[in-house]
Amino acid sequence: MGPEALSSLLLLLLVASGDADMKGHFDPAKCRYALGMQDRTIPDSDISASSSWSDSTAARHSRLESSDGDGAWCPAGSVFPKEEEYLQVDLQRLHLVALVGTQGRHAGGLGKEFSRSYRLRYSRDGRRWMGWKDRWGQEVISGNEDPEGVVLKDLGPPMVARLVRFYPRADRVMSVCLRVELYGCLWRDGLLSYTAPVGQTMYLSEAVYLNDSTYDGHTVGGLQYGGLGQLADGVVGLDDFRKSQELRVWPGYDYVGWSNHSFSSGYVEMEFEFDRLRAFQAMQVHCNNMHTLGARLPGGVECRFRRGPAMAWEGEPMRHNLGGNLGDPRARAVSVPLGGRVARFLQCRFLFAGPWLLFSEISFISDVVNNSSPALGGTFPPAPWWPPGPPPTNFSSLELEPRGQQPVAKAEGSPTAILIGCLVAIILLLLLIIALMLWRLHWRRLLSKAERRVLEEELTVHLSVPGDTILINNRPGPREPPPYQEPRPRGNPPHSAPCVPNGSALLLSNPAYRLLLATYARPPRGPGPPTPAWAKPTNTQAYSGDYMEPEKPGAPLLPPPPQNSVPHYAEADIVTLQGVTGGNTYAVPALPPGAVGDGPPRVDFPRSRLRFKEKLGEGQFGEVHLCEVDSPQDLVSLDFPLNVRKGHPLLVAVKILRPDATKNARNDFLKEVKIMSRLKDPNIIRLLGVCVQDDPLCMITDYMENGDLNQFLSAHQLEDKAAEGAPGDGQAAQGPTISYPMLLHVAAQIASGMRYLATLNFVHRDLATRNCLVGENFTIKIADFGMSRNLYAGDYYRVQGRAVLPIRWMAWECILMGKFTTASDVWAFGVTLWEVLMLCRAQPFGQLTDEQVIENAGEFFRDQGRQVYLSRPPACPQGLYELMLRCWSRESEQRPPFSQLHRFLAEDALNTV
C-alpha cells in the first residue's frame, strides 16, 4: 500500500471518528516544557532589554537559577511610575507559552532586589505587541516576595508568541532585578490569526455570554480580526454550554456562539491565516449540540483556499454536508475533509441548521509545503494583511519537544490547593468578623461614657470611597455625639475649636487628604500638627457616576450648619460594591420609603424587540449594551415623540443586571429605575421601559445616533479659524467642521439639562463630554454611563485600586470633603464647557499628574493664591472664559446657577466674541 493510500485511509478513519474526540487537539496541561532560558538553549543574542544598570546586570544575566554577572538583569531606569523598562526574550519561532517563572537577584546573599509584580507583552511578528490579560481582564501578575525564591505563574489563557517582554512594576521608586524562564511548547499548526463575527449573548433563565473574551486581535464593527482567542486556547467545551471547565467564569465561557437571526445569509463566515503554505487534510470543529436550548451542529461547511493575501480564491470550494446522530445532545468534534488543498488562507462558511452555532475549538491537520518560504523566520515578514471579511480561526495541534525533561507541574489551581485556600480564607474571614465585632463593642462602651462636647466651627471631610472613607463632623450643639466619635483630648475646652496654626496645616493633618496621596512616595511639604482626636474614620457616601438625589425632609442625617446657605444633602446609603452596571462605586441615595415612587409607572418593554449591536461598558454586576429596536412606532408603550424616520431602527442603551447580582445590587437597580422614570427633559436621556418580569433585569433608555460628545467633537475641525491658534490650526480640513455658534448651542443644551436636574435637586456628579450624547442636528442629551466604558478609564483616578473618581472634573470640596451639590455640578460644567471649546483635543489639566491635581484641590482649600486654573481655550473669548472662572469659584455660593448659565449661553454668549 503506497503512501497516498495510507494517507487517504488515515483521513477516512479520522472523518469516521470525528464525532468522538478532537484527534488533532493539543492538551495545554502537557504543554509546559522549559523553553531554554535556564539551560541556555536560548542564546544570549536572543535576550535583550530596554536598558541595564551595568554590563554585569545586562539582559544575558536574566536566566532563572543562574548567578552570572551580578546575578540578574537590572534596568538602568526606574520602573515607577511609567513602567517602561522591559526584558525581551526572542523564541525565534511561534510557541504556546503556558507558564512563566520569575526570580529576583540573590547574588549569594549580596542582592536584595526583586519585582513584586509585572506585566507581560508579546508579539507574533515583531511589530504588533499585545498585552497579556487573564480571563477576567487583569494584566498585573503577582511576582516575588524575596530575591531568591522562584515563583511560577500559570497563564490562563496561554499566549501564542515569538517574542515575550517582561515589564517589572513597583509602587514606589526602588531598584528591581529579574531572572525569568518561559514554559510551553512549539506551536506547529502555524495558525497566525482567525477572523470571525463577534460572539453574541443568549438569554435563557440566565444570560449566557458566548463572546470570544480572550481574543487578542482587533474588534471593529462587529468583526474580530488579526488575532487568536478562545477558539485556539485548547479548552474543549462541555456538553452543557452553560457550564465550564474553568473556575470562576461566566456561563457560556467555553464557547463562541452566533444566532441564526443575526445572519440573513444563513451562515457564519470565518477566515484563517497561516504562517506558510500548507497542504490541508482536514479541519476539526468542536461544536455543541444541546438542541433543547437551540444549539445545533452546522448543517454543512464550505471552504475556499488561496495562497496569498492579494490573490483570488482558487478553484471550486470544498463542500461537506454533516450527518451523524444529530439527536444526540452531546458536544462533539466534527471533521471536515479538505482534500490536501494547498493554501495559506482559508475561508470557511458554517451553515446554520438551528437557532444557534456554538464552537469551542477549531484545529487543522496539515503539512508544510516544502518549497514555501516561511512567513516567520529569522527576519520578520512584511506587515501582515488583515482581511476585511469575516474572521480567521486558530486551532492547533502542537508537537511537544520535551528535550528529555518532564513537564513543569502546575504552579497553582489544583483542586486540593483551591479547597485548602478557600478553607483558610473562610477561617480568616470569620476571625476578622469576630475581631471587628469586639472592637466595635469596645468603642461603643467608651463612647457611651465620653463627654458630649462640640465645636463652634464646623469641619466636614468625606472621602467617598467605601472602606477608605473619612468622616469628620463637628456641629454646634448636637444632642448627642456622632457615632464612633472618640473622646476629646483633655485640655480642649468643650466649646472651642482645636488649635490649628493655619489652613495649610489643617489640610496636611486632614486624614482624607493624606489618604488620597497615600499611593505616592512624596513626603509632605510640612510637618502638620497631630491628627485631632476627633478625626475618626468611618464610612460615608460612596461615589458613583449616576445621579444622586437629596434626602427628603423629615429625617436629616445631621442638623445643617446655620452659616451654610447651600442646601444640605443627605448622605447616601453605603453600597460596598463596584457599581451595578457602570461606575466602580455606586451610591443609591438615602430616601424615605416611596420617595422615588412618585414618577410615572414603569413600562414593560418587549425583550424580543431588542437587537444587540455592541457592548458599551460594564460594571461588577451588569453591562450596558447598545441595541436597536425595529419599527419603534409600533410600540404603543413609547408614548412620547421619537424622532425616528419610518423604516429606521431606534438606537437604545440597555442596562442589564447579571443574574448573579447580589440582593443589594438588585435593589439598587430597581431604585435607579424609579429615579430614571422621573426624568422628563429633552436634554436628558429618558427611560423607555424595563424588563423586570424575569432575569436578566433590564432598563432601556434612549441613545443618540452620533455617540458621545467627546468622540464626536474630537472628529471635527473648528469652522471659524479667525481666533488665533484655534483647535485645528495647521491641520488639513479632512474631517467635518463645526462653527463657534454651534459649540455654544451644544453648551447651552448641556446647561439646560443640568438646569432641569437642579430643579429636582438631583446631582449628577460625573458631568463631562463623555457623558453627553449627540443626536441629529446637534441635539444633546446628558447620560450617565461614561464611567463604565474602558475607553475613558484614563479620565478616572483610582483610590487604592478600588474606587474611581473623575478628579479632573471635580470641585475641590468633592475631592477633599466628598461634598456633592448642584454647585459642584456647576464646577464640572465649567470643565465640560472648556472641553467643548477645545473640541475635546486635550484632557483637563493634562500637564498635571493625578497627584498634582489633588494637590491643586488642596491649594483651593488653603486659598493662598497658588491654585491653578484651566487655561483659556484659543477659540474662547475673554467674556466666556470669565464665566468659566466663576464656575470654579472657591466658595460654592459664588458659582452661577444653571439657569443663569443657560441664559448666558443661549442669548448673550455670541455678543462676547
UniProtKB/Swiss-Prot annotation:
One of its GO terms (cellular component) is extracellular space. It is an enzyme of class 2 (transferase). Changing residue 379 to A: Phosphorylates in response to collagen, but at lower levels compared to wild-type. Phosphorylates in response to collagen, but at lower levels compared to wild-type. Changing residue 213 to A: Phosphorylates regardless of collagen presence, collagen addition does not alter significantly the levels of constitutive phosphorylation. Ca(2+) 2 binds at residues 230, 233, 235, 360-361. CDD domains: FA58C, PTKc_DDR1. SMART domains: FA58C (SM00231), TyrKc (SM00219). Tyrosine kinase that functions as a cell surface receptor for fibrillar collagen and regulates cell attachment to the extracellular matrix, remodeling of the extracellular matrix, cell migration, differentiation, survival and cell proliferation. Collagen binding triggers a signaling pathway that involves SRC and leads to the activation of MAP kinases. Regulates remodeling of the extracellular matrix by up-regulation of the matrix metalloproteinases MMP2, MMP7 and MMP9, and thereby facilitates cell migration and wound healing. This is Epithelial discoidin domain-containing receptor 1. The lineage of its organism: Eukaryota, Metazoa, Chordata, Craniata, Vertebrata. The gene is DDR1.
